[in-house]
Regions:
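Transmembrane alpha-helices and adjacent helix-loop boundaries
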Residues: 2-378
C-alpha cells in the first residue's frame, strides 16, 4: 500500500522531471497492458473475469464518488442507475423486442437516460441531508429493482424475475468480443478483449472525474460538502450543482451498466439489489472518499478480496482442522466483514485518503482527547 502511494505520489511531485514522470507512466502502462495475460496464465480465466468486474466496479465507484465524495450527498440507491444502463442495453440489443442496436448508439442513450433518472432522484431530495437522504435514495433503488422485477405483465417488457437472456455481446461491426479475436500473429481471448474495452472506458471516466474535480463545478461541490449554507451565501447555485452531481454520477453508472449487460449477456433484477449499492459505497468509503486514486484502489481491493476469501475459506479449514467445519461461503463473508471492521477501526479516513481528509480526521481526533494524550498517526 505504501509503495503504491509513493509510486503515484512521484507522478505528482515531480511534474518537471520528464524522465521520472514518463518512466513511471510507462511502467504503469506496461503493467496494465500485460496484466490480463499474466492473470490468465498464472491464475486462469476465473480471475481474469474477476479482473474485468473489478474495472466495472471502478467505474461505478468513481460515479458514486462524485455524489458522496465530491458533493457529500449520501446515496444508498446508486445501483439503480447501473440497472437502468444494463436494462436499456438488454432491451435494445436482444431478442426481447427484436432489436439489435450497436454499442455506439446504446451507450450514449443508456448514459443519458441514467443521468435523467439521477436528476429525477435529486430534484425531490434537494433539501435532504444525511440519514434522511440515505433513506430516500435507498427507497429509490429498491423501487427501480421491484419495478424491473414486475414489469412482465400485462405487457412483458423486462421478462420479470427471469431476466433477459441472449443479449448481444459488445461488437464493432462484424467483430464480436464474445469470440476470440484473430489478430493474425496471435489470438486474443474474449475475456482479454473485454478487459481492454473496460480499461479504456475506465480511463475515460477517470479523466472526466479528474477534470470535474479540478473545475469550478468540482470546487462548488466541495463547498457544498463542507458547508452548504456558506456555499449558498457565496453565490453558488446549490440546487443546480447538486442536481449536476446526481446526473454525472448516474451517467457513469449507466455506462458501466451497459457494458455489464454486453459482457454478461444476461440481466435480472437480482443483480441490482441493496447489497450491491452497499458494496459500491464501501469501495468509496474504505478507499478514501473524494480521493480518486483511493476510490480506484478501494474498488479493486473490495472486488478481489471477497473472491480471495472464497478460494481460501475451505482449504484453510481443511489444513487446520482436517475437515470443513463452517460453510465456506459463510466463513468468506465473516472474514470479509472482519476485514472491513478492522479497516474502519484503524483507518477511519480510508486506506488512501486525500491529504485534506487525513488532516480533517486528525483534527477531530485531537479535539476529542486531552492535550497531554498523544494521538496515533494515521
Amino acid at each position: 500500500m505504501k509503495m503504491t502511494a509513493r509510486f503515484f505520489a512521484r507522478l505528482t511531485r515531480h511534474p518537471n522531471d520528464d524522465r521520472v514522470h514518463w518512466l513511471a507512466w510507462a511502467l504503469l502502462g506496461l503493467l496494465l497492458a500485460t496484466l490480463p495475460w499474466l492473470v490468465a496464465e498464472g491464475f486462469g480465466n476465473t480471475w481474469l473475469r474477476i479482473l474485468n468486474f473489478a474495472l466495472l466496479y471502478v467505474m461505478l465507484a468513481l460515479g458514486l464518488n462524485i455524489v458522496v465524495g465530491f458533493a457529500g450527498l449520501l446515496d444508498m440507491g446508486y445501483i439503480a442507475f447501473y440497472a437502468v444502463g444494463a436494462y436499456l442495453w438488454a432491451l435494445l440489443a436482444s431478442p426481447q423486442f427484436g432489436l439489435h442496436w450497436p454499442m455506439w448508439a446504446i451507450l450514449p442513450i443508456g448514459a443519458g437516460v441514467a443521468g435523467l433518472f439521477g436528476v429525477l432522484l435529486g430534484a425531490p431530495t434537494l433539501k435532504l441531508r444525511g440519514d434522511y437522504l440515505a433513506i430516500v435514495t435507498l427507497g429509490f433503488g429498491e423501487i427501480i429493482r421491484i419495478f424491473l422485477n414486475n414489469l412482465n405483465a400485462p405487457i412483458n417488457i423486462t421478462n420479470g424475475p427471469q431476466g433477459i437472456s441472449a443479449i448481444d455481446a459488445v461488437h464493432f461491426g462484424s467483430i464480436s468480443l464474445a469470440r476470440p479475436l484473430d489478430l493474425g500473429f496471435m489470438t486474443m481471448p474474449s475475456l482479454v478483449s473485454y478487459y481492454y474495452l473496460f480499461l479504456f472506458a475506465a480511463l475515460i471516466i477517470i479523466g472526466i472525474a479528474i477534470r470535474l474535480e479540478r473545475s469550478r463545478v468540482g470546487r462548488a461541490w466541495a463547498a457544498i460538502r463542507e458547508d452548504e449554507v456558506a456555499a449558498k451565501a457565496c453565490g453558488i447555485n446549490t440546487r443546480n450543482v447538486k442536481l449536476l452531481a446526481f446526473a454525472m454520477g448516474a451517467t457513469f453508472g449507466g455506462v458501466a451498466g451497459g457494458l455489464f449487460a454486453g459482457f454478461q449477456q444476461f440481466v435480472s433484477p437480482e443483480s441490482f439489489g441493496l447489497l450491491e449499492s452497499v458494496m459500491v459505497l464501501c469501495m468509496v468509503v474504505l478507499g478514501g472518499m473524494g480521493h480518486i486514486p483511493g476510490v480506484i484502489f478501494g474498488a479493486l481491493l473490495l472486488t478481489v478480496l471477497p473472491e480471495f476469501f472464497r478460494h481460501i475459506a475451505g482449504p484453510v479449514q481443511q489444513s487446520l482442522f482436517g475437515s470443513v467445519l463452517v460453510d465456506p461461503e459463510s466463513l468468506r463473508m465473516l472474514m470479509f466483514g472482519l476485514a472491513l471492521v478492522l479497516v474502519m477501526r484503524y483507518r477511519p479516513s480510508g486506506l488512501w485518503p486525500s491529504p485534506q481528509r487525513r488532516r480533517e480526521i486528525e483534527d477531530v481526533q485531537r479535539a476529542d482527547v486531552p492535550a497531554d494524550v498523544p494521538v496515533s498517526p494515521m
